[in-house]
Amino acid sequence: TMFIEDIMNKIIPISLERNKDDCKAVLDCKENDFILIKNILNSLNRTHREESNINRLILNIIKEIVRNIVWYGESIYEICKVSDNDIKIVGLIPNNFFDFKLFYIQMPPKNNNKILYPKIISNKLLWTISVPKILEKNYSFKTILLQIDQFDSFMPKAMKNDLYKNNNTSSYDYKKYDEKCFIFVNDLTRDWGWDQRQWTSNSKTTEFYNIYKQIKFRYSISILREHIIFELNNLFFRLGINAKIKLENVITQNEYKEKLENFLKGQITYDEIIKFLY
């Protein structure tokens, strides 16, 4: 969906992607831990080739984790410690995972050729990243994924079938249906403030509301981005590695929150907020 695409496309700001204005991801660690950490991160880097540049590698990892979250509602990995100098983080598909507090059971996919047995994994060996609770006040992310595509944005399925059959559909109010779909998705994604790509004022929104949504959505994205950085640093702590990832010169969630509050209070002009956003 467009909602998923927008999260994935905005999780890494353009300034960070291009190292613009000194925006970059940095790793603070001991020199003798650097190779181990880079190998751990590269084991997470499943959809990209092995990366030697640490800034690029960290950005790829953030994208990888977000991709799993927006597809499955969470990102789950198994910690495979071969030795103190060889640790791999293996991605798992969250489907058919059952949490029993002290351990997880992963049910195998159906296979007609051979018998597959459930896999028991200690929770000490699992690393799970979920959507921050602040972004799930009204609806869980999994609920959003289940419901956001249930209505066609153009017309109901039955009406579409009538159209294909050349039946008379002149009495159908397409505009009203479109408005109802907009309201439904707007409510479903209200914790995120997604603008549904409504960038200009129209019959459904005003310019003020559209700008508010743009700030709110970027604020939500920054919350998710900083949450992932926190979880990566927490992973290092679990592995007994003294290291910390941080983003330099990137707009923080607190800065977005402040701008959002000032905009709602009328303490910042349209020109100032547009300049801040772009």
Residue positions per predicted region:
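C-terminal helix-loop subdomains that flank or include functional centers
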Residues: 56, 194-278
